[in-house]
From Swiss-Prot:
It is found in: Secreted. One of its GO terms (molecular function) is pheromone activity. A component of the complex of water-borne protein pheromones that stimulates attraction and mating behavior. Its main location: secreted. GO terms for cellular component: extracellular region. It comes from Aplysia californica. This is Enticin. Binds to attractin and temptin. The keyword Secreted applies. Disulfide bonds join 25-33, 40-52, 59-67. Residues 69-88 form a propeptide. Keywords: Disulfide bond, Pheromone, Secreted, Signal.
Amino acid sequence: MKTALPLLLLTCLVAAVQSTGSQGCPTYVSEKCTARLQECSNNQQQEPLQNCTAVHADCVVQATEDCQREQSQLNHDHLNNHTTTQQP
């Protein structure tokens, strides 16, 4: 029974991803990179502001790619689960 809980969480995650589609990415990217930008500006003594802008831009690109890759992987797994579990 120990495997039931993570599986249930994964199912919820997949459902959430599918319901938001790629629209979920901007929120994910914004949250992740806003935190990164805040962290950078807090360390203003070490890094000039234009570095923070570059860091933020890189973060947006990377996080968007990560999010889209995760979504396509989750959707792929979800489809596989349906095709394999519906056998008699």
